């Protein structure tokens, strides 16, 4: 959403198409029930991870924007994908354009992570307090 907005698109969270990988039933009822039920998915995800590993694939969250429409989903990526080696809070932005069609431009680096995000929030609080 941030990149879409920076590109000049007026987009809100409800405009982003999401593809759930958790059963819809998990979202019905209190949040406490969600957290209690979540571990029941662990074995299935681990089995899938092991199967993908044999095929030299991994699961990655990938968000896309095309023609002003945004979506986010859990995807299987091959070991030749730039997303394959992402770990921790690392991120990749891959720009596929008319000029960068066959070989998209990649921007890769650390995402915020918990400590950087906390430092940013603290800096914002201090900035507001000094106004």
Show the residue positions of the predicted features.
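Catalytic, metal-anchored helix/loop core of enzyme active sites in primary metabolism
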Residues: 64-131
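Substrate-binding/catalytic subdomain of NAD(P)-dependent oxidoreductase enzymes
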Residues: 1-85, 90
């Amino acid at each position: 959403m941030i990149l879409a907005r920076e590109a000049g698109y007026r987009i809100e969270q409800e405009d982003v198409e999401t593809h759930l990988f958790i059963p819809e039933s998990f979202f019905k009822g209190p949040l406490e029930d969600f957290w209690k039920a979540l571990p029941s998915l662990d074995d299935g995800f681990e089995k899938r991870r092991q199967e993908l590993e044999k095929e030299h694939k991994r699961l990655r969250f990938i968000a896309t924007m095309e023609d002003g429409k945004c979506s986010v989903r859990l995807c299987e990526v091959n070991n030749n994908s730039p997303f394959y080696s992402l770990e921790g809070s690392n991120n990749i932005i891959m720009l596929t354009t008319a000029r960068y069609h066959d070989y998209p431009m990649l921007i890769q680096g650390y995402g915020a992570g918990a400590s950087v995000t906390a430092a940013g929030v603290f800096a914002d609080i201090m900035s507001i307090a000094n106004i």
